[in-house]
Amino acid sequence: MKPPRRWMYGRGGGKGKPAGLLLLGVFLCLSVVLLLLLHGSSPSLEGEGRKPEAVEAAGGGGEEEEVAVARAEVEEAPLPPGNARLAFLFIARNRLPLDLVWDAFFRGDKEGRFSIFVHSRPGFVLTRATTRSGFFYNRQVNNSVQVDWGEASMIEAERVLLAHALKDPLNERFVFVSDSCVPLYNFNYTYDYIMSSSTSFVDSFADTKAGRYNPRMDPIIPVENWRKGSQWAVLTRKHAEVVVEDEEVLPEFQKHCRRRPLPEFWRDWDRPIPAEAWKAHNCIPDEHYVQTLLAQHGLEEELTRRSVTHSAWDLSSSKDRERRGWHPVTYKISDATPALVKSIKDIDNIYYETENRKEWCTSNGKPAPCFLFARKFTRAAGLKLLDLSLIAANGASTM
């Protein structure tokens, strides 16, 4: 009796091969068929982690459905292994004059708990020729916009940075940093301070000063949602997504929020300011946008309504032109002293006059300094503070 045909497969010609080789050939063929079947039924790499329902919902819908599916993917996709990160979002003109200060700060992390994104002028690239810190090599975003101070282009730059940083699911907090900003504490203290809170840190208060809110924004942005504050915020991932997905508030800012057409150092003018300039609304977009947007979405209960970045705005007695006009005090090398740093670190509460509100500063439920960062510092001032180990110190002490 002849053996079953399946055991004769591949023998050919009467000079048969060992049965073991035939079995191996059969198993290889079956394996190939099985792999092909599995490949045809599994999601692509681009859609990995997406539920079948979400894939079906993506077809045949409009832009709103696409946004909803994208949001669902972010919520459903499991985090890859690794530590939650702080995404540092630097807004710079060109180079980063304080890159060596930040280099010392980032060296304090040994666990991969940060990422860096830099928005500079279009075409600027961070290389060995343009930065002295390897942490910043090629960290510029590739679709930057030309930013003009006091214009809506500043908030467009913020949105570009957030969009890039949100691509990394490990980024859980988003820290806006200026090119004149220094870290007051070491990395570990800064990380623990920010991550111990489930809220965003957003300087936000009701703006009652006449001339800033433009009634043309109503009814899309009612006056009761109008807020003001520092642009140097720390956002949770949820709030960062709200900013990037906004299609309602941003257009109103682009049309109706513009700074008053005064010269930069108008306080020093020795001639009258044109009357038309005083009649114009004086709205600085980046000092209102995030605050107003989050109020619009009813998210103020999810905020710690203060900034963690210190700026000095007491300009009344200053005779230095660089310290007057629209901008906060710039600290020079002569200002960079232990007394200055101590005075900033000692601040433990902030008072908001328009709301008669005092914000006591805490971290992890305990009293804490209000500020983790400070600006504006020249390069020389920042390096002096670093040499004195007054900032970004990575020793045993966090304070």
Curated annotation (Swiss-Prot):
Primary site of residence: membrane
Segments crossing the lipid bilayer: 18-38
Sugar attachment sites: N142, N188
Molecular function terms, GO-annotated: glycosyltransferase activity
Residue intervals on the Lumenal side: 39-399
Record keyword Acyltransferase present: no
UniProt xrefs under InterPro entries: BC10-like (IPR044174), Glyco_trans_14 (IPR003406)
Localization per record: Membrane
One Pfam family it belongs to: Branch
Membrane-topology annotation of the record: Single-pass type II membrane protein
Tissues expressed in: Expressed in roots, culms, leaves and panicles. Expressed in vascular bundles of leaf sheaths and stems where sclerenchyma cells are developing. Expressed in mechanical tissues of young organs, such as young leaf sheaths, stems and tiller buds.
PANTHER family, per the entry: CORE-2/I-BRANCHING BETA-1,6-N-ACETYLGLUCOSAMINYLTRANSFERASE FAMILY PROTEIN-RELATED, GLYCOSYLTRANSFERASE BC10
Descriptive protein name: Glycosyltransferase BC10
Organism for this UniProt entry: Oryza sativa subsp. japonica
Upper taxonomic lineage: Eukaryota, Viridiplantae, Streptophyta, Embryophyta, Tracheophyta
